[in-house]
Amino acid sequence: MRLLVPAWACLPSLLGQARVLRVRRIEATDSARRRRLTRETGPATDQSLLHKLLKDAGSDKSFHHGYTRFYVSLFEPLREKPVRLVEIGVEQGRSMKAWQLYLPNASHIYGIGYGNFQAAGSRPRDCFADAHTRAAVGAGVPCTLYQGDQSSREFLDAFVAATGGAFDVVIDDGSHVPSHQRLTFERLFPAVAPGGLYAIEDIETSYWTRMNRPMYGYSLKNETSIVEHMKRVADAINREFRYGGGGGQSPLPAVYDSVSTIMFAHNLIVLRKQLPGESRYSDRKYRFYRDGHCPHHQTSC
């Protein structure tokens, strides 16, 4: 027996399909609008070689975080030099390929991935064991992957000892836990070469909260936040003025005394190490050493 369904009975279904189609059209339009907006407003650094290499490697440093906005001007002077670069948190080593291509004269590139440094099979290994990838990036740029825990002081010290330090660039893209970021900086920054750069990515975790509670036990006004802690580096750099006549005193451990500059950017902090002779400006005795005034027996300072 054939059932005849009146046309009006199909109306809700037809309307529902129309709504779905309309939503899909809106989503497609919004997606196209977002793509167009990205093309129109993307910074000029999106056209840089570094951005392209990181994007092609699948690294979110380019297309999501946009760190290349800052890295291009910082790293471009290093391109042809025999630099030593370390990246912490390399996952499967995707960005390692980009660094090798971007720094063709690099002395050595090191990656640190999470793992047990002491376990069997966790010994340092070549970044690209397969012949195809090795041929693509070139055999002239040594690249070694280590496995270890950046919350372990012992591992960080062992890594510096094994590699010899003297790093020109260190990039912390590891656990993003603020206490790990601070420990890693304090163990590796002494191994950075004079004039070298140290970048801490994903400082967003110092702002995270869940149900009005800091997710990592920190808060922005808590000094254990990496953002709040690094704000104090400005005081360490300017310790000549902060401490009146007590040149050489600093509000932070001595490792911070060798910081020349610090840059705060979107989701990123970059520090540069002093060159030889720079410390004399921060460590000298301030000429206006008593509350900003000259000593009584002097008419000028």
Predicted regions located by residue number:
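A short alpha-helical cap/connector motif
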Residues: 2-169, 175-200, 204-301
